[in-house]
Amino acid sequence: MSEAAPTSWRSRAVRLVGNAVAVAGIVFVALTVRRHLAALPPLQLSPSLSVSIALGVVANVVAMVLGAWTWRTLLAAAGAPISWRSSFSIVGRANLAKYLPGNVFHIVGRAGLAASEEGLKLPLVLATMTIETLMIIAIAVALGAPAAVSQLDALRAMVPAGPWLLLGALGLAVALVVVVAVVLRRRRVVVGSVALAKVAAADVVTCVLLGSSVYALLATAFPTTTMPWSICVSGFSLAWVLGFVTPGAPGGVGVREAIFLLLAAHSTTVEHPTLAAAFSAAIAATVVVGRLQSVVADVIVFVVARAMAPAPPQGRVATIK
């Protein structure tokens, strides 16, 4: 019997760092929940509103499932297929780190887990994640364009650089597409148009689903709202992408809510002062509850993904010659 083979110190280091990031993410999530609960306006929970809130959480969970599916689709197209279980487990555990300051730790976490658990090369992981990110940004910008055009003055009032951020996001997306294409071609990795079409379709479903959940919440909290569903979905997509590209906004917290709040307020006309005040309160409650729905969904996905994670190596493994 030979000497026992020690567990890779790199694998242990990655797991320790991953656990530390996960714990830090949980702490920041708790702080986020506390801050949003404190900002929540008085809200009377009716059965219909409770159902809307629950369905919003489900919609956010489904969005996470679709996100894991799109990454797995890109990996398979690039010649590095992994199981659905692994894809969901890696994405779900790493996602919680997006609430850490810097807004990059979920990317680092996913790359580390993919390397340590699936043996995927870092350039391939980063390339597929870059394509995934560019696709969702492009789809969100396309869906958010109607809201941006119709509420351009309001957008400038809230975020003076907002239009430039959108143009910058598009320019960066185009530049990165070229860079990623060159890198993949040099490595003889080709992601076909079919895979890209699947990812684009999933991204459209994600944006429409999440935007619709916000609309359902607003319509339930304020039944007489005149905000069109299409503008709500478009406004959500616009707020999402601006929150994503705003530097230093962990998980887009604060930025997305503020932008959607402004767009919703300017896209709806309520003449009666009392109704106007009620509508403003309903919008405020909607954006706060919407963020809480997202946080709760992220925690649920993290718990499930953690349970699905492979067991860590048991230190030393005996081998027989």
Task: Show the residue positions of the predicted features.
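Membrane-interface alpha-helices at helix entry/exit sites of multi-pass transporters
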Residues: 85-89, 103-108, 115-133, 272-289
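Re-entrant/interfacial helical elements at transmembrane boundaries that shape
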Residues: 104-117, 249-266
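A generic structured-segment signal
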Residues: 83, 94-99, 108-109, 124, ...
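Predominantly cytoplasmic-facing regulatory/coupling regions of multi-pass membrane proteins
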Residues: 1-92, 140-142, 146-248, 255, ...
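Juxtamembrane transmembrane-helix termini in multi-pass membrane transport proteins
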Residues: 72-75, 111, 126
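Mid-bilayer segments of alpha-helical transmembrane spans in multi-pass integral membrane proteins
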Residues: 95-104, 133-145
